[in-house]
Amino acid sequence: MTQKKPIIGITPSHNTENNDTSLRPTYPKAIAAAGGLPILLPLECSDEDIKQFMDVCDGFLFTGGPDINPFLFGEDTHLKCGNISAARDHLEFRLLSAAMDAGKPIFGICRGVQVLNVGL
């Protein structure tokens, strides 16, 4: 019998200039190479969707990308901040809270570590 692969939910990048979401192919490739089954999470989802992700996913990868909104950690937006996505911030902070409550493993890369730092 084949062992069930862990399902890993991956947060998408969001380009606010054209409202595109994307994912670097290296993220799902790395998860698959480690024996996981990667799935891309939608940028916009309800609280019910977040709850369902907790039932479906065994862990979560918070990917790299532009900075989170400095307002979320009590700072003003610096002129050098680019492409701040309120939609991505909203998804990732709700997802982080739910994953922590559910005891799910979380891994952050670059921006993902910023989310963990601010969210915890």
Indicate residue ranges for each PLM-predicted region.
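Catalytic nucleophile loop
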Residues: 113
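N-terminal beta1-alpha1 cap of cysteine-dependent amidohydrolase-like domains
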Residues: 1-109, 117-119
